[in-house]
Amino acid sequence: MINGYLNARYVDGGRGEVVSGVRQFDCWGLAEAVRQELLGLPRLPEFGVISRHDLKGSAASYRCYAGYLDEGPPRPGAIAAVIRGRLCTHVGVVLEIEGRLAVLETNEATGVRWMRIPDFERTYLRVRYHLDRDL
């Protein structure tokens, strides 16, 4: 199920482009691709820049997404948003892996990986989960 994503490469702004046979994602691109491709969820509307190099722009986009999605408990397909201060600095997507909830994420330091919810919440101390209204 997720094996095709585990070999992807982290690239800021990556939305799943294939370069030399390897898909490239940043954290938002990976979350969107997994939601659409694995879970069949509709693409979320574009609200602007999402880049680790533009945290203010990303924060503005996050506020739009947070208003569009409901906050709630982790469920498959939910966006796991990492919050620092008033900024969303990172996202992952919740999946059921080996019968338990986990977050699939990517970042420059680790590449694509998955972590059980308790491990994700220990790594990132403030996490909010955002769900499609019909999940």
What does each model-found stretch correspond to?
Residues 66-70, 124-127:
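Short secondary-structure junctions
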Residues 91-113:
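Catalytic Cys-His active-site segments of thiol-dependent hydrolases/isopeptidases
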Residues 1-69, 76, 82-85, 89-90, ...:
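N-terminal capping segments
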Residues 52-55, 101, 115, 119-122:
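Structured surface interface patches that mediate subunit assembly and partner/cofactor docking
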Residues 75-76, 99:
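Residue-level preference for short coil/turn positions at secondary-structure junctions
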